[in-house]
Amino acid sequence: MKHFNGKVLFLDRSNINTDEIIPAKYLTEISKEALKPCLLEDLQLEGFDPIRDIDGKSVIISRSNFGCGSSREHAPWALEVNGINLVIGESFARIFRQNMFNCGMMAVELSPETIENLFVSFAEKDTLIETDLEKQRFIFKAGREKKQVPFEISEFDRQLVKAGGWVEFADSKY
C-alpha cells in the first residue's frame, strides 16, 4: 500500500486539467521517472513555482473538478513519481478519479465548506497530514493547530488502495 501522509501542497484553483498536471508533449514517455520533472510545469497559478513548491510534498489539496480534460493515466503517474499519492478536492473528473484508484492512489472529495476551511486554516502554513484509511479520517497538523476531517470512499476503492491498484487487486483475486 502506498503512503498517504506527509506535507501538503495547496493549489487554490478549480479546473486544473490533465494538460496542466502533465503536458501532452510528454505523453510519449513510457517511463514514469521521465515524467517527474514535468509535473504541473504548465499550471497557471499566481505565485506557484513547480520546482520550488512540489519537492517534498505528498498530498495536494485543490478546489473543484481536478483532473478534468483528457483521460490519461499519465496524470496519476506524474503525481506518483513525485511522491504525491493523495489529492483532496471538492470534486474530480470521473476518469481521473478512477485512474487514481486504479493506480492505488486516492482522490478524495470533501465538501466545498470543508475545503474552504482547510485553505483558511492551513494553506499559509507548513501543514502535515496523516491518513487513517481504516477509520476514514485525515488529521491535519500545523504547529499547534490540529484538525480531524472524516472522509468516505467506497469499500471497493479502499480495497484497490490497500492492494496497490487495480492490477494488484485483480492478481490477488483471480
Task: Enumerate the language-model features and the residues they cover.
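N-terminal, positively charged, Ser/Thr/Ala/Gly-biased leader segments
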Residues: 1-26, 168-173
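Conserved phosphate/anionic-ligand binding catalytic regions in large, soluble enzymes, centered on
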Residues: 16, 67-73, 161-170
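A generic structural signal for short, non-catalytic loop/turn and secondary-structure boundary residues
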Residues: 1-4, 32, 124, 144
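Glycine-rich, flexible loop/turn motifs
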Residues: 12, 17-18, 22-23, 31, ...
